[in-house]
């Protein structure tokens, strides 16, 4: 049990570093307030051991505050760029990288999870429906994965995607906002409000 707890802690610490790094990178486009929100999310991830992710309904209610914001309408060129970037993600390669984060899971299990996150993220960008992506994380927890490990793998996958983006700055900004919205919604309702009030409106 002690070993498992140690692996979990390591996963959360490394995921937290990855999200903070992603916040710094995307914060170059979105500004210091975004970096601060990403840092807050990263700190929450780091301390998530023993905690539970929010329910699907609560998380979706938070996320919908962001996606319903008219300023978050994504034009076709940006949407295509973001979908394309997901299509180019090598799930095995990403799982290997994430496998270095911790012994809390097997790389083979993560490949399948990366594939699912990719598939549901593409659906989110293409249809505007992020429910399937949120249900995916919930299904991991229902299958017996600790909330903290589920949050860690999920956040790390999205963070690795965001860090790999070689797309136009506006598209990077959109991906960054959505990543913070999706991960933040699983942790606390406050992140949606912060993104809406401090990042999205001023950016447009």
Swiss-Prot record:
GO terms for biological process: defense response to Gram-negative bacterium; killing of cells of another organism. The chain crosses the membrane at residues 139-161, 165-187. One of its GO terms (molecular function) is pore-forming activity. It is found in: Cell membrane. The keyword Membrane applies. It is a multi-pass membrane protein. It comes from the Bacteria. GO terms for cellular component: plasma membrane. Gene3D superfamilies: Colicin. Keywords: Antibiotic, Antimicrobial, Bacteriocin, Cell membrane, Membrane, Plasmid, Transmembrane, Transmembrane helix. This colicin is a channel-forming colicin. This class of transmembrane toxins depolarize the cytoplasmic membrane, leading to dissipation of cellular energy. Colicins are polypeptide toxins produced by and active against E.coli and closely related bacteria. Belongs to the channel forming colicin family. This is Colicin-A.
């Amino acid at each position: 049990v002690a070993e498992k707890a140690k692996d979990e802690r390591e996963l959360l610490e490394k995921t937290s570093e990855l999200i903070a790094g992603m916040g710094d990178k995307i914060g170059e486009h979105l500004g210091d307030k975004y970096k601060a929100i990403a840092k807050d999310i990263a700190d929450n991830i780091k301390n998530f051991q023993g905690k539970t992710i929010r329910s699907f309904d609560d998380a979706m209610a938070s996320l919908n505050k962001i996606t319903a914001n008219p300023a978050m309408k994504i034009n076709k060129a940006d949407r295509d760029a973001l979908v394309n970037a997901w299509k180019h993600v090598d799930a095995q390669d990403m799982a290997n990288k994430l496998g270095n984060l911790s012994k809390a899971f097997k790389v083979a299990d993560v490949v399948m999870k990366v594939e699912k996150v990719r598939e549901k993220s593409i659906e989110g960008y293409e249809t505007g429906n992020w429910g399937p992506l949120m249900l995916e994380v919930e299904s991991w927890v229902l299958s017996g994965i600790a909330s903290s490990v589920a949050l860690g793998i999920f956040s790390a996958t999205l963070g690795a995607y965001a860090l790999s983006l070689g797309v136009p700055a506006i598209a990077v900004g959109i991906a960054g906002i959505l990543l913070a919205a999706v991960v933040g919604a699983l942790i606390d309702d406050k992140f949606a409000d912060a993104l809406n009030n401090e990042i999205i409106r001023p950016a447009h």
